[in-house]
Amino acid sequence: MAQTHAMMSQFNGRKRVRKFFGKIPEVAEMPNLIEVQKASYDQFLMIEEPKGGRPDEGLQAVFKSVFPISDFSGTAMLEFVGYEFDLPKFDVEECRQRDLTYAAPLKVILRLIVFDIDEDTGSKDIKDIKEQGVYMGDMPLMTTNGTFIVNGTERVIVSQMHRSPGVFFDHDKGKSHSSGKLLFAARVIPYRGSWLDIEFDAKDIIYARIDRRRKIPVTSLLMALGMDGSDILSTFYDKVTYERDGEGWRVPYSVDRFKGMKLISDLIDADSGEVVAEAGKKLTVRTAKSLAEKGLKAVKVSEDDLLGCYLAEDIVNYETGEIYLEAGDEIDEKVLKILLDVRADQINILDIDHMNIGAYIRNTLKVDKNESRQDALFDIYRVMRPGEPPTIDTAEAMFHSLFFDPERYDLSAVGRVKMNLRMDLDCPDTVRVLRQEDILAVVKMLVELRDGRGEIDDIDNLGNRRVRSVGELMENQYRIGLLRMERAIKERMSSVEIDTVMPQDLINAKPAAAAVREFFGSSQLSQFMDQTNPLSEITHKRRLSALGPGGLTRERAGFEVRDVHPTHYGRICPIETPEGPNIGLINSLATFARVNKYGFIESPYRKIIDGKVTKEVIYLSAMEEAKHYVAQANSSLDSEGRFTEEFVVCRHAGEVLMAPRDHVDLMDVSPKQLVSVAAALIPFLENDDANRALMGSNMQRQAVPLVRAEAPFVGTGMEAVVARDSGAAVSAKRSGIVDQVDATRIVIRATEDLDPSKSGVDIYRLQKFQRSNQSTCINQRPLVHVGDRVEKGDIIADGPSTDLGDLALGRNVLVAFMPWNGYNYEDSILLSERIVADDVFTSIHIEEFEVAARDTKLGPEEITRDIPNVAEEALRNLDEAGIIYIGAEVQPGDILVGKITPKGESPMTPEEKLLRAIFGEKASDVRDTSMRMPPGTFGTVVEVRVFNRHGVEKDERAMAIEREEIERLAKDRDDEQSILDRNVYARLTDMLTGKVAVEGPKGFSESKKLDSTVMGRYPRSQWWQFAVEDEKLQNEIEALRKQYDESKEALQRRFMDKVEKVQRGDEMPPGVMKMVKVFVAVKRKIQPGDKMAGRHGNKGVVSRILPVEDMPFLEDGTHADIVLNPLGVPSRMNVGQILETHLGWACAGMGKKIGDLLELYQETGDILPLRQRIENLMPDDNHNEPVRQYDNESLYKLALQMKKGVSIATPVFDGAHESDINMMLEDAGLDSSGQVTLYDGRTGEPFDRPVTVGYIYMLKLHHLVDDKIHARSIGPYSLVTQQPLGGKAQFGGQRFGEMEVWALEAYGAAYTLQEMLTVKSDDVAGRTKVYEAIVRGDDTFEAGIPESFNVLVKEMRSLALNVELDDARELIAQRVLSDRVEQ
């Protein structure tokens, strides 16, 4: 991003300057791209927080939820006090090299309280309290780049998307019942605990299920909560009072009850007796209201109108207690008669009209067989624990533990918040269990839905899906570990003498440590980091997966879950997702999105106040956004920030609509906020078809880092952000001055925030030719020179695939779109030989080979140069220890590490015995098991590491490596020491200069004014002996000296620690005495069969590499680098590549013009034309670098950078338009059609018509033909079937499968078929004979019985079918003999 500084006139040439085409100013800062990972894990560990004041979240919450632990009798309790981390044993780099896990020891402070219990009263007194820190295993730490190092490999924990806890209302879409009736259901999902489902059936009875078990009527659940029948009815229904009035009944008149009713009989005023509305009339809301206004208080109804109503209360004879009718009974003729008999003059009726209010709860109550709370509890107990006889206590306890026990049931804060929102409750989010009100509210809402009021939930809405990041996943895992530990602690507390033990003795931390190890090592969400290039690392860390434990499975996930949802806007990228079975289940976070404390994804918006768009930015989740009208970032605004159009395109409640401008209250912050990082790197994304953009995003992640990285001419402005946040390019931690630079490190003397406790020196170690997880090469190169001023955040070194701090995945190459002799048929790519000769697409890959010398039963293996039966020639590259030299060129079959293994003694012939007695020949009892180069790999050895077990004597090579390492550490220490000395003595000189010293070193005459000459007479170390009169200054000098001594001591201590680590032996797997790792660098030039791609999903395979002179060329004699097929564009609809071609062409043309002016400046010394050209190119606006303020030297540096081609940025959805491209082309003096006349390289003739030519940014993908091509003659065979193995990794053969056999059968090629199925496969004896015959030069062979036939026979015998094989020739001979005998 271009930063504008008012006074900046210097350009250091260490960053790429781009011309921005974006019109929309950036309001919000893009959050750090790997913040998701770092923030989540920091919140979990809370290392920085003070031990006492940690909030209840993360690790603290886990311990708080499991502790305190009491024993079964209650005589002792183990309490949690706090936890702290010690420093990790090894730093990140050491863990990588030694295959260790980067982790810090966790120490938990526990308090054991022992009680005295009075046996008579049962009261407790504290008898004893012991507190102790207990080691609880190692907790992996996150590196600065958001990864973990587990057993030496970098891993990433992917965030998981899952269904948010809370309550969800849904229906079955009419699928369950043949009538197509919608059956509504509600589901309460806790974070952990039992699920509660409440659902309608086809008969409109409401049932509840717990944990998907057998259903029970919902009224039983309500009874179990302590309600009786009449409570339930009065909770769900209002009452209407009917009073007897002569022949009929009188009912109070209410507007709500009567509106919308069609009258069957006349409506009669009960007081006056007049008809206020005739039969057959429909009462509208207006009519109903006007009647009430006219004073209608009650209406008269006949006896018949009571039929079909339901009683709201029991009808009881109060004297005898006899119940005549029960609440909920339906009134029919019989009931009316009873009402007459008992002279009930006033009865309460349930307000059920079957239109607005249905009788579902009343009907359910009638169906329910349970009468009391006890019945209901027993019923629930039988459902949950079938086969166990219930007692009232066990049933109560079980029911309580289902939903009301914080140990067993946890809604989590999120669940409570979601529940409050959905059902308008106000319950604090600390109440994490269900309450009776919650269950009632769910049932009420479900009934409302059935009555046609309210909306069902959309489970794919991002308001109902949340993200579980590293911290939370780890928290759940650790809780499982602690719960396993809790059981063991309880048992141990009961079995030991509690007065004498310490907390340490009660705790076995193995289960907790094992849970952590299992999570990082084998969880589905802990993944081997995709480290092909910086973009793939960042994308991997920002990935959201719906798979994994507690998530979906590929097979069960339907279309809806995978689909793009309106709420994804600005939160999840609609483009970047894998092709194949995981499509839509694995997503990527959008560029500006962040995850809030509840785990919902938030997107930023600008506030609009009184129609004016402000700079104020707020983050909203999908739920909060729904009620707003959100305008797009590219809506046109006037100078005051008001909308120019009357109607604005905006989003509201998931729909896109045109809204009046005064309705709009929010606006997007940036046009790229809806896509992910990878998609935001594609220029002209808006002109590409979405499917191709998806491929483009995915293929950028597979680009191999090239030997010479080159940033794209046509970028999007995201390149620098990705390079910085991924950690590939090294940025300065503090401002300072570069003190030393070489290829492996940069030493910077800090000039800001010089905290006395911190060192005043920053040493940046650069990674040189390290192997990444994908075997690509990680190499960092310094960009600074000694004496350069560096600001905080400046890029000081480039990493893999970065160029001047910009992401650089490929190269800019000159492309012509035209067919060429069929070599670009079906997306093939025709390349020029120049690309190979100039190493344009050459990459370095580093292979790691590892060999271990073990202790075997027959004796130890040995790594040595002394290998039996190997020619001296084969050992030429090995040193005396048997390990290859660094720099040796190796090819397939070369020995990398010589190793011999003892073999079992075989009985010796007398001759051998004699020879051994004479020569002491030992070679016969060992066999050569050296590590050799695998087939197909050629390269150079770049690094060797030797690891020895503790106490095993080190060989010469190990000692040499160790010496080298210690020298390097010493150099670091000395450099830091010299800068420390320089800084401290400079400060001391400043303090002393001009002051009068009252005493000093030996031979110093008192009361002399100090200056450089006086002080220069004494060595620096004696300057501390000068004393001055000013007491305050003297104290400052003493403090400086103390600080200096402490820093020196700390430095030496650090150095000694590291040396001790280097000299100490290594942790090894059991049985391994010594291990050697050899790293071989392989240089891969591009060749036919390699896969290449652009950024727009335009992929292809190199078909041929053509001599430069045969390639088509331009009028100035420049040959095209690549020829692509024009037919690859129209059907794929990725027109972005054509626009990129034109713009790239303009950039190169412009660069050429600047190059010419640069030459002019070097000849004449006149910089004005160059300055004008560059200033015209980069107008002053909010995006561009302020080139007008550059001094001449800066301008010259900039022109040098632009000479190859001007870099531009065209942000997604806000980039260059056709008119801009035409202008650029015209400025560069090129034809605005973007087409030129091309000439055939072979004949020199011009082609028939002009051809589109320009620069495209092409990538070489990690699908290299060298990794795929494979051949075998003799190799390993499978043990059982004796057939060759398959696959390159196993050095396998080609499978001659079922269909291939059919083909040979169809041709009747019997002998070929026999050969394929026997001697070339699993006829063991036959294939040996063939080999011997070929060696003899004989080409005849005889096929035997294939081994797989014998396997078949064995299998048949195992089925008790005796199959015996008879030799056919013998059978025929016998038959012939018997025939003769008969004759």
Curated annotation (Swiss-Prot):
It comes from the Bacteria. Its EC number is 2.7.7.6. InterPro entries: DNA-dir_RNA_pol_bsu_ext_1_sf, DNA-dir_RNA_pol_bsu_external_1, DNA-dir_RNA_pol_su2, DNA-dir_RNAP_su2_dom, DNA-dir_RNAP_su2_hyb_sf, RNA_pol_bsu_bac, RNA_pol_bsu_CS, RNA_pol_bsu_protrusion. Keywords: DNA-directed RNA polymerase, Nucleotidyltransferase, Transcription, Transferase. DNA-dependent RNA polymerase catalyzes the transcription of DNA into RNA using the four ribonucleoside triphosphates as substrates. PANTHER family: DNA-DIRECTED RNA POLYMERASE I SUBUNIT 2. The RNAP catalytic core consists of 2 alpha, 1 beta, 1 beta' and 1 omega subunit. When a sigma factor is associated with the core the holoenzyme is formed, which can initiate transcription. This is DNA-directed RNA polymerase subunit beta. The gene is rpoB.
